[in-house]
Amino acid sequence: SEDTSSIRSSLEAFGCGIYSQDGSGIDKDTDVVCISTAIEESNADIAAARASGLPVIHRSDLLAGIIKTKKTIAVAGTSGKSTVTAMIFEFLTACEKSPSLISGAPLRRLKKQGLIGNAFCGGSDLLVVEADESDGTLVKYSPNASVILNVSKDHKDIGELRVLFETLTLKSEWSAINADDPALASFKSSMTFGHGNRAMWRPDFV
């Protein structure tokens, strides 16, 4: 389809090679195979990698490693992650900080440039990451700063989500918490934001 062709072109422009999932993409030049939670163990590429003795790592482990090498802001929460991740990335870009981006949703401005949209390699050591909670792997991340937007039942129960998000804040050097969400009230934070009086930063301050 046209959409698939466009995505392929954008990925190739980003430097990604596209291969059929039949194991043919695993060759002597392959160093490591990275998979997401959605990839089953029976996948032909995984079988080829294991047969060749190549390491197979989860996407979250690769991302955790990247996060450690950068000055990273991780955005988490049940909803609004992609939007706030994009906002922070655009703010830093406007301030000429040349950040990198790893997000779940594509940014329109980047797509208009023919890029894939949800990943961008900037010229500085700043990185803005959308930290997805759906498979629980965000607890592997140790960012410089984390932003927790909200908690509501979605991929997991609220109690389990609270543990995941709080763990992320405890592994962060600095954290910002939505003071309007009572489910986050017990979280320790460096700064709070929201509309209510409990928030350290509110829209009417700007």
Residue ranges with predicted function:
Residues 1, 35-36:
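Thr-Gly-centered strand-to-loop micro-motif
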Residues 13, 20, 25-30, 37-191, ...:
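Phosphate-binding loop of NTP-binding sites
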Residues 125, 197-199:
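Short acidic/polar mixed-charge low-complexity motifs
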Residues 196, 205-206:
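Active-site glycine/GP-rich loop and adjacent strand/helix microenvironment
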